[in-house]
Amino acid sequence: MNFTVPEETLEIINGLKQFIDKKVIPLEEENAGLLYNERNYYLENGRRHPKVESLRKEVRVASAEAGFYTMFGDKELGGEELGPITALLTQEAIAKNYPNRKLIDPIVIPSPFTNGITPVLRGLKQELKDEYLDGIRKGEKTLCFGLTEPDAGSDVWGIKTKAVKVNNEWVINGTKQWITNAPYADYCMLFAVTNPELHAKRKGGITCFFVETNSTGFNVDSVIPVMGELGGDAGIISIEQLRVPEENIIGELDQGFTKAMHGINNGRLGMSGKCIGSAQWALKQAIDYANMRKTFGKTIGEHQTIQNMIAESAMDIYAARNMALHCAWKIENTKKTTGERNLDGKSLLYGNVRACI
């Protein structure tokens, strides 16, 4: 394994930073009163202001035109299919250099769960690809990942949303919760139980459906506010007698769990890059402060206790970064089962969350 950053990856990251500095940052500064004042950013119902949504769309479209928005998507979906290592390092660079910016993450580079050409969409029928993918690729349309429920989070097999076939349609009923981008999405990748017997045995029985969010029977009841804020990005979805055509099944009937993992595992890798970048930014802030703040006639960075704390943080970040690179390398260079990648992903995320803490 050689973790030297390829020249091509460095060029991509530098080009992305130039795009952000020239296109996105000026747009943020021009609209700072809207973007960085919560009472302007959110409406009373917790949803983002329509003007905010318009700005986010403007950035998505510009990123797509510049070639960044789709660069990690599959080639069969119209992306560049750049590898996991480049994806990890790119997310790291964004989080490290542009922390907590309103129009950057996950807008310039979309989340594998929601916006952009997520690998889950490989399972779409060709007719649906022809109809929907162009708008998604261009950043004009966004998605949400309808898996989590009130009683089913990490335990995917605990979902209760059911789909019953009636003639050539599936009638779906249930509730989804903590669904990122649900209040704003144009489409939903919706997971439901289609075979209760297989589902009970945890051997299948879950199917993924492609749904337009303006369909009758699909309702976003409320936005779930982020702690300390007046609104949020996630929502609660009620599904009542939602009728979905047979051809809107993503992938194979009863095999939706595998499709879910396609999005989740990619998402874990991207999240790890964000955790590492955020931790690197936080460490720099700590070092800068330690070199500035003085007690007992010298900077606190000269006190051994503070040095130990900073050193331990640096070691955690170093370990997490190498764990993430190792995982990305294995995904890029070896063939592994979904279960093996799932285990790698969990270990990876644990290490990176520890680094952030």
Question: What label would you give each PLM region?
Answer:
Residues 139-147, 191:
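A short, Trp-centered hydrophobic/proline-enriched beta-strand micro-motif
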Residues 1-102, 107-111, 123-128, 135-140, ...:
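Alpha-helical interface subdomain recognition
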Residues 122-124, 164, 190-194, 210-212, ...:
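Short beta-strand-to-turn element immediately C-terminal to the catalytic PLP-Schiff-base lysine
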Residues 115-123, 145, 197-198:
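Flexible, glycine-rich active-site loops centered on histidine and acidic residues
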Residues 214-245:
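Flexible, small-/acidic-enriched active-site or ligand-binding loops
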Residues 169, 173-220:
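A short core secondary-structure module
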Residues 132, 159, 175-177, 221-225:
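Short beta-alpha junctions and helix-cap segments that line functional grooves
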Residues 151-154, 178-181, 199-200, 225-233:
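Short Gly/Pro-enriched turn/cap motifs at secondary-structure boundaries
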